[in-house]
Each structure stands twice: as C-alpha cells, then as structure tokens.
Amino acid sequence: MTTPPSSPLSDPRRTEGVHPTHTDLDRLDPLALVQVFTDDQRAAVEAVRAAVPALARAVEAALPRLERGGRLVYVGAGTSGRLAVLDATELTPTFSWPPERAVPLIAGGERAIRQAVEGAEDDAEAGAADVRAAGTGPQDVLIALAASGTTPYVLGAVRAARALGALTIGLANNPGTPLLAAAECPILLDTGPEVISGSTRLKAGTAQKIALNTLSSALMVRLGKVYGNLMVDVKVSNAKLETRALRLTCHATGASEAEARAALAQAGGRVKTALVMLRLGLSAPEAEVRLQAAGGHARVALGEG
C-alpha cells in the first residue's frame, strides 16, 4: 500500500530523517560515541556560516527599532524555547540591556523551562495570545525559533507579531518550512539529520545557539555596548565581574589600578562611564551627559568617530 504524502511516516523534514552513517550507534564504545557526537557538531557551525547573509540582514532590519527603544521578544518551544530564554537572560549581565526589553516566551510558560509541558507547542492560539499579552508592537523585534519550522505555538506567535507591526525573524533547521515563509527575516540553519534521529537538542540546537549568540551580540555591538571588543557595558553584580570591570577600565585607559578603582566607584561600577571620565578628565555626571549625547557609544563620546 502506498503511504499518503500527509503521513508522518513520510515526514519530509530533514531534522526528522535517519542519519545513514550512524545506524550502528548503539554498538559503539564510549570513545567512538564521543567522537561521533563531537564530529557531527561541525555541521552546526557550517549551517550558521551559510546563514551569514541572512543573519546580517536581520541585524540591519532590527537595529532601527531597537535604537528607538524597542524590545527583543523571543519565542520558542522545547529546546528552542529554552535557548531563547538563555539568550534573553544573558543580555542584562553582559551588556546592561534592560531586562524589560528582553522578553522570552516559551510554550507552556516558565514550567516548560525545567520540564516538558505536554501539548503546549501544538497550541497556535497560545503563541498568539502570549505575544499579545507581552504588549508586542511596531517598535519590537520578535525572534522565533523552531528546529522543525512547523511548531504551531511559534507560528501563531509570528503571525500575531506581524499583525501587530513587529519585525519578525524566524530561525528554522529545515528548508521550505512555514516559519521561514511567515517571518520577514527568514534564517535557515540547515543541519540535516541528527546522530540520534529526531533529537534536535543536538546539532540543530547548537546551530540555534550559535545563531542567537551571533544575532544578539552583533546587535549589542552596533548599539554601542562595546568599545573596541571590550565589554564596557558589563553589569557588575559579583566579585568576578567587579574584577573584570577593573581590568577592562585599566586596559582601555592605561590608568593604574588605584585610579581605575576610584573612577569606577564614582561611576557606580559603570565601566563605560569610568572610561570616558579617565580619558577626558571628566566627572561622572559630565561623562554620563557626554555618553547620552553620543547615544551610549563610547567611541563617539571620546571623539573618535
């Protein structure tokens, strides 16, 4: 009997395929297993490399909205949702990005971060409702992730966000999927079949993580969150970061440890402010005014263009 095209037995998604090279996986010893899994991760890097033009277009499209005070709204389910939460959460300590401007939405809510919530990803209306409840609007940028490219929760969120005027960026690991068609900025991460068939927490997830790192980091750089390649907007919240702030300030200004400590104390721990203070001989309030006039860009505040 012929299997109809709609049958799950004929799933066309590459991430659901059986990898022909690893059919004896359960017979391998630990060393061989580790080699197989690590070698396969290289496909994730290559998939992201192939997506560089699409990632760059997404950065260019997102920047104007974020410069006007818009938010990053992340949407995903399962592994993709957890990666979305991770990227959104790390923007504040790394770049002092306001937490209210990084909004992660995961199918099933916060409980889904730690455990699977059955059926949550199949609810398109829940995705749309979550986007509306987050107050998504024309200034915002929605980043949607789904390895399959077909997750109803994510598709519902993207369609709702577009209707509300938000910019939509869609990352999927299968070509020709609804998510890539629905998003204004589609990004294909074509990783192919997994070593363990269908386990997209493997290289599909790795590719998504690399792409998210790239996308959000590039945005933060263009928004003035670094000076050179120095993390001058780091949010000092523990001893390790306090030491990092001191080291960065000394490196960027040539100041002594004592001078850098004093400037950081006056600047409330803000490296960027201390940098401008020490380089231009300004007080903390004067440095803050200069930075505000420069749109938060240290290089512009220093008159370096």
Curated annotation (Swiss-Prot):
Reactions that this protein is recorded to catalyse:
N-acetyl-D-muramate 6-phosphate + H2O = N-acetyl-D-glucosamine 6-phosphate + (R)-lactate
GO BP:
amino sugar catabolic process; N-acetylmuramic acid catabolic process; peptidoglycan turnover
Q: Where are the residues of the annotated region Disordered?
A: 1-24
One Pfam family cited in the UniProt record for this chain: GKRP_SIS_N
Q: Where is the composition biased (Basic and acidic residues)?
A: 11-24
What EC class is this? lyase
Query: Which stretches make up the SIS domain?
Result: 62-225
Identify the catalytic residues.
90 (proton donor), 121
The UniProt keywords, alphabetically, are: Carbohydrate metabolism, Lyase, Plasmid
Specify the signal sequence span: none
Q: Which domain of life is it from?
A: Bacteria
**One of the record's GO molecular function terms:** ether hydrolase activity
Q: What is its EC number?
A: 4.2.1.126
Instruction: Look up the record and name the pathway of this protein.
Output: Amino-sugar metabolism; N-acetylmuramate degradation
The miscellaneous remark of the record is: A lyase-type mechanism (elimination/hydration) is suggested for the cleavage of the lactyl ether bond of MurNAc 6-phosphate, with the formation of an alpha,beta-unsaturated aldehyde intermediate with (E)-stereochemistry, followed by the syn addition of water to give product.
Q: Which family does it belong to?
A: Belongs to the GCKR-like family. MurNAc-6-P etherase subfamily.
Q: What does this protein do?
A: Specifically catalyzes the cleavage of the D-lactyl ether substituent of MurNAc 6-phosphate, producing GlcNAc 6-phosphate and D-lactate.
Q: How does the annotation summarize its subunit structure?
A: Homodimer.
Name the record gives this protein: N-acetylmuramic acid 6-phosphate etherase
UniProt source species = Deinococcus geothermalis (strain DSM 11300 / CIP 105573 / AG-3a)
